[in-house]
């Protein structure tokens, strides 16, 4: 794992008590360090995403299938043509079929790669807009990505989890704050109202009691942490996200 100087971890440690031991989970493209804290003082940071790990009424974990892979977004974003080509040729297995087809035409290259359709799973959330607090950010992102109104979402704000994500393919780091929550809908009801959009292709539902992969490991750590005593917290136990937005 490469060295990374977090933009907010020193402030988090200073004002929030550590709740659980840190863990590291990884796969072939990401290394994620997770640390849980009692929510005593948390604020929005313009460079840190806020995400929610949400359980449905039929006990499923809601995960989003990102439309564009992180690698594809990086290839499109970078202006360095050499870097574009290098990422495409070396890591095309980490693209989905449509992305490989688009980039093959763009570069007039046909890299030797498996004909797989890679899934990029993420939890709903994103970076707060200017002036947004945590509840407002979560409300907007969950509505935009999953089409769920905040009146159906309940967030446990007694604690939060700080994550440092190292993307070993594009060689970049990202920070995220996770909250645990519940949705007063079944997975089928969520699927019925979901509309594919420019960010999220479709939805995935995980079993919290069995599974594998990064998203399962993150959820397991979060749900295990939720069982701990959060002494000194300044949050709420599964408060309505709508009410949290109105209160703030």
Curated annotation (Swiss-Prot):
Check the record and name the InterPro entries matching this protein: NUDIX_hydrolase-like_dom_sf (IPR015797), NUDIX_hydrolase_CS (IPR020084), NUDIX_hydrolase_dom (IPR000086), Vaccinia_D10_decapping (IPR003301), Vaccinia_D10_N (IPR013683)
Q: Which GO terms describe its molecular function?
A: metal ion binding; phosphatase activity
Superkingdom classification of source:
Viruses
Location within or outside the cell: Host mitochondrion
Cofactor requirements of the protein: Mg(2+); Mn(2+)
Chief location of this protein? host cell
Q: Which GO terms describe its cellular component?
A: host cell mitochondrion
Among Gene3D superfamilies, the record links this protein to:
Nucleoside Triphosphate Pyrophosphohydrolase
Placement of sequence motif Nudix box: 125-147
Matches recorded under PROSITE patterns: NUDIX, NUDIX_BOX
Instruction: Give the protein's function.
Output: Acts with RNA polymerase to initiate transcription from late gene promoters.
Q: Give UniProt keywords alphabetically.
A: Host mitochondrion, Hydrolase, Magnesium, Manganese, Metal-binding
Endpoints of the signal sequence:
none
Q: How does it assemble?
A: Interacts with the late transcription elongation factor VLTF-4/OPG110. Interacts with the late transcription factors VLTF-1.
Q: What is this protein called?
A: mRNA-decapping protein OPG122
Please state which protein family the record places this protein in: Belongs to the Nudix hydrolase family.
Where the record annotates domain Nudix hydrolase, the positions are 45-227
